[in-house]
Amino acid sequence: MQPVLNVEDIKRVEIALTRVGVSVSELMHRAGYAAAQEALGMGGDISNVVILVGLGNNGGDGWVAAEALRSRNCNVKVVTPLEPDQISGDLARQMAQRAVRAGVSVLVGPSRQELIDLLATADVVLDCMLGTGFHGKVRAPFDIWIECLNQSGARVLSVDVPSGLSAQ
């Protein structure tokens, strides 16, 4: 893990950027593209990518990364607890719908065994489940997904913070 900024620093930077006209959507695109570039730079063959997404902005970053990786001819599978059209956050839902239109493959609410089998095929897994706003106890399905991911032995790139850990 390579921490760069703490949560309060991130909030200050985001507020400053929005004050000078950078939208939250633009920030999400930048984060998603940066995550995709980082994944591609991890070394070795990066052709099969699994992205575990949550329902908030961290998940939105994952959907943007999925679209970017798909455009680089990676086989991308996004694992999500809900259908893209059912995501409640407007921005994350828009990013999910856009990624689906771009041809990103989606797996909704997999069983434990389905997830274990999928993770075994991944060259890299992007963890975009829970971001810097997370605190408290991890709830289903993310508790199961985190357990499967930790036991998989897969190479993992966490966006913002490893899911389940408090950034506070």
Model-found features: residue ranges?
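Glycine-rich phosphate/dinucleotide-binding loop and adjoining beta-alpha-beta core of small-molecule
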Residues: 1-5, 43-52, 57-168
